[in-house]
Structure formats: C-alpha cells, structure tokens
C-alpha cells in the first residue's frame, strides 16, 4: 500500500491526459506546471515524475499532461529500485504511446496537411478525423498508423534521464516562495525555471521529435507514384543532415522554448484568477468542481498555446524543402495570411481523443502491474 501511495489513480491519468500541449509542454511538465486545486490537492493529484510534488508557495504542484503521469521513485529507495521504476516507466510509456499512436499520427497529419499539400505530398485536404483515418488506411495500410511511433517511444528514456539531471539545479536556482517572496517574483521564477529546465531537456531530444514528426507526416506522395520521402528513422537524420545540416534537425526549436513559457504563464494566470472565484462556499471542497476546474484550466492553457505547436511543426516540415520560413514569426504570419487562424488549431480535436486513449490504456496497464507484481511501478511520461 505504501508503494501505491505515490502512484496516480485512474482519474488522475484521465485528467492528465487531457492536456492539449505536445513536446514543448513536456519541458513544462518536467517542472510541475499544474497546481492542484482545493480538494483536488488531497484526492486527485499525484507527485510528478520530476520533483515528487514540489511545493511552491504553499501550492502543491503536480503534473497534468498529454502523456501519462510518471511517479518517480522516492530517493530513499536507492538506485536499484529507481532503475526498476525507470525501466517499468519506459514499458508503460511504450504501451501508452503505442496504443495511442494511430490517433497521434492522424493528429499530426491533420495539423500539417497544408504544408504537405504545398510540397506535393498530399493530393487534397482531409475532411476530418474519420476521413484522415480512412484515407491513411486505404492508401498506406493499417500498420502505417504507427509510423513514427518508434522515435516517440525512444524519446522517453533520454527525456526522463535529462529531467532527473536538471531538476535539482533549476529547483535551487529559482526557489521562490509565494508567501515569502511575493506573487510576481514566484510567478516569474516559475516561468524562468520551467523555461530553463524545459529548454535544457528539449535541446537533447528535439531531433527525435523532429524525426517523429517527419515520419508521421510522410504520406505516400500524391504525385510521386506512392513513394515515401523517408525509409525510416536513420534515413530522416541522414537526408536532413545532407540537405540542411544540424540546423534542419532543430528547425522550430526557439518557438518550442517560447511555448514552454507561454503555457506556464497561461496556466498559472488562469489558476490564480479562477480558483478564488469558482471554488467558494459549498464548492470549496467539492471533488467534481475541483476536477472540472483543473480540467478546464489545463485544456484552456493547452488550447491557447496550441498554435505554437502548429507553427513549430510546420517549420519542421520545411527542412529539406527549397522554400522555408524565415522565422517563427514569418511562419505565423504566412499561415494566418494564406490559410486563416483556423489552420493554427488543426488537429486539436484528435489530440483530445489521443489523450483519452492513452489514459485508458495506462489505467489498464496499472492494474496488470498490480496483478502480476503486487504493486504499481512508474507510469511513463514525456
């Protein structure tokens, strides 16, 4: 029972999976972006995979993410047990990501379809999630729905190791307390620590996210006789380095780091504004009200920052192409001018479905761990 106390419940995973962010927000999750809400503190949150529930200014700060929550091994367990939790978390991440991979690929295809059309790799726009699923299976086969998943699973391990390496340093560097140092200093410290830790981890694993994005969006050429652009993960690196050099693997990195800070600012801003207004009177200790508020804030911040994810992935898609965006601002302005604001939110609906699917699979996986091992190990995040 003591072992299970640090593990997220089914509802925690379900709520955590609703986060609409993506890779840039993984750096945010590494710094515990989501403060708990009232009774949500006591009944619904868990220690995050980075700091085991870092407390900032009296607010317990758990993680809510688009990826499953990973509960890190407590320090007193020792290296051996931590490694077991780390590896089991990897298995958990692989299971969750693989189960949700078809929806993830559809999300990326819908999100980047306009870039694919410009490059001549898609004949016509997708009409929706169902149309994207149907056309992908018809043109490429059922197994193609998992294209790019290998890079996504591999990315988990270095991300977790880097998060573990960076967490203590940035925790000490920006250790402001809300009640002691004041709100704005605490707020700024949260943005700075999240941005620094997120960017540090992201720097080392960004190329894997780039490769995953390119593979997932590598639909059989509309005008090329059904030929793919890349033959696998290694081929993505080889062709990108040949055409664009190292810069090609990091296209969109700067806006990704900005996205970390934007998400943190939106989350904490909405939390501090809505909690005193909504959770009052009889709702103060109401579990469902607390959960609803947490869900609303997480999705609100994720949806508001979603255009940043779209811009960075659209920039990724131009590596190897003759025409590239000059900067993230150029990409943003061109997308708005030529396609409209709606294009910045393409794929957001599929992202919600992916989150729900991942949470459901992880919940079942946790029960299997209890059945076979007598306890729950860490659940793969990132």
From Swiss-Prot:
It is a multi-pass membrane protein. Residues 312-317 are annotated as: Important for transport activity. The keyword Transit peptide applies. A motif (Nucleotide carrier signature motif) lies at residues 312-317. One of its GO terms (cellular component) is mitochondrial inner membrane. Keywords: Antiport, Membrane, Mitochondrion, Mitochondrion inner membrane, Repeat, Transit peptide, Transmembrane, Transmembrane helix, Transport. GO terms for biological process: mitochondrial ADP transmembrane transport; mitochondrial ATP transmembrane transport. It is found in: Mitochondrion inner membrane. Gene3D superfamilies: Mitochondrial carrier domain. Solcar repeats lie at residues 80-173, 185-277, 285-371. Its main location: mitochondrion. The transmembrane helices are not perpendicular to the plane of the membrane, but cross the membrane at an angle. At least 2 of the odd-numbered transmembrane helices exhibit a sharp kink, due to the presence of a conserved proline residue. Monomer. This is ADP,ATP carrier protein, mitochondrial. It comes from Oryza sativa subsp. japonica.
């Amino acid at each position: 029972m003591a072992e299970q106390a640090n593990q997220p419940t089914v509802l925690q995973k379900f709520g955590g999976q609703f986060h609409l962010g993506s890779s840039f927000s993984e750096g945010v999750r590494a710094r515990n972006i989501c403060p708990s809400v009232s009774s949500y503190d006591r009944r619904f949150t868990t220690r995050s995979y980075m700091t085991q529930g870092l407390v900032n200014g009296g607010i317990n700060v758990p993680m809510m993410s688009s990826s499953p929550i990973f509960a890190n091994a407590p320090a007193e367990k020792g290296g051996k047990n931590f490694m077991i939790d780390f590896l089991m978390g990897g298995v958990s991440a692989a299971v969750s990501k693989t189960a949700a991979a078809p929806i993830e690929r559809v999300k990326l295809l819908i999100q980047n379809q306009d870039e694919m059309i410009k490059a001549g790799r898609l004949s016509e726009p997708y009409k929706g999630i169902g149309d994207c699923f149907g056309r992908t299976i018809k043109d490429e086969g059922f197994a193609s729905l998992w294209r790019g998943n290998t890079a996504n699973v591999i990315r988990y391990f270095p991300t977790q190791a880097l998060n573990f390496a960076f967490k203590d340093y940035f925790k000490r560097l920006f250790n402001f307390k809300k009640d002691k140092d004041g709100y704005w200093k605490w707020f700024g410290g949260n943005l700075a620590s999240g941005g620094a830790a997120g960017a540090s981890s992201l720097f080392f694993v960004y190329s894997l996210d780039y490769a995953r994005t390119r593979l997932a969006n590598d639909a059989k050429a509309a005008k090329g006789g059904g030929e793919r652009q890349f033959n696998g993960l290694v081929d993505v690196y080889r062709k990108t380095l040949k055409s664009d050099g190292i810069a090609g693997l990091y296209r969109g990195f700067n806006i990704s780091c900005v996205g970390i800070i934007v998400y943190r600012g939106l989350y904490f801003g909405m939390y501090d504004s809505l909690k005193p207004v909504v959770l009052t009177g009889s709702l103060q200790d109401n579990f469902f009200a607390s959960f609803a508020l947490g869900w609303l804030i997480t999705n609100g911040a994720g949806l508001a920052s979603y255009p940043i994810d779209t811009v960075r992935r659209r920039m990724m898609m131009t590596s190897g192409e003759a025409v590239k965006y000059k900067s993230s601002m150029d990409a943003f302005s061109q997308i708005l001018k030529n396609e409209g604001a709606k294009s910045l939110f393409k794929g957001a609906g599929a992202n919600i479905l992916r989150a729900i699917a991942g949470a459901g699979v992880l919940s079942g996986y946790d029960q299997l761990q209890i059945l076979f091992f007598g306890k729950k190990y860490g659940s793969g995040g990132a």
